[in-house]
């Protein structure tokens, strides 16, 4: 069971998603299917089709493509991390919006946090794992 988060003023459903170093805050309200990310449309913000699909796939799984508006604020990381953060935040917000969507979101693994993070650079190495080239002579 996920905690239901609603805006106290206008009743919007809220959800927060994280992926790598990206954080997305998603607000779902009844509407016509308009998606706004950091003040831009989804086509302007996510140029890559795969990034856009990560978001629209969540709406399609819920069956709410044309019936809700999304206001999204996302920061940190790159485009792939941000798309993943928005995907998870949207799934959480949709579960707050309608409790019946929890099972389809869980089955589609939209609510599963991707825990993979960048591995830190180790001392004495050039990167996280890459060492200095070995010379026998």
UniProtKB/Swiss-Prot annotation:
GO biological process, one term: translation
Magnesium keyword on record: no
GO MF, one annotated term: RNA binding
Skewed-composition ranges (Basic residues): 118-137
Keywords from the named record: Ribonucleoprotein, Ribosomal protein
Domain of life of the organism encoding this protein: Bacteria
A Pfam family assignment: Ribosomal_S9
Positions of region (Disordered): 114-137
NCBIfam families recorded: PRK00132.1
Similarity comment: Belongs to the universal ribosomal protein uS9 family.
Protein name (record): Small ribosomal subunit protein uS9
Species for this entry: Rhodopirellula baltica (strain DSM 10527 / NCIMB 13988 / SH1)
Lineage: Bacteria, Pseudomonadati, Planctomycetota, Planctomycetia, Pirellulales
């Amino acid at each position: 069971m996920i905690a239901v988060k609603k805006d106290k003023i206008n009743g919007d459903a809220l959800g927060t998603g994280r992926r790598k170093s990206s954080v997305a805050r998603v607000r779902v309200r009844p509407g016509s299917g308009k998606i706004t990310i950091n003040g831009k449309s989804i086509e302007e913000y996510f140029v890559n089709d795969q990034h856009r699909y990560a978001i629209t796939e969540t709406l399609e799984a819920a069956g709410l493509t044309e019936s809700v508006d999304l206001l999204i604020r996302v920061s940190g990381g790159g485009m792939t991390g941000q798309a993943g953060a928005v995907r998870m935040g949207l799934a959480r917000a949709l579960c707050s919006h309608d409790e019946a969507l929890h099972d389809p979101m869980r089955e589609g693994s939209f609510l599963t946090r991707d825990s993979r993070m960048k591995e830190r650079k180790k001392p004495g190495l050039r990167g996280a794992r890459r060492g200095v080239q070995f010379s026998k002579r």
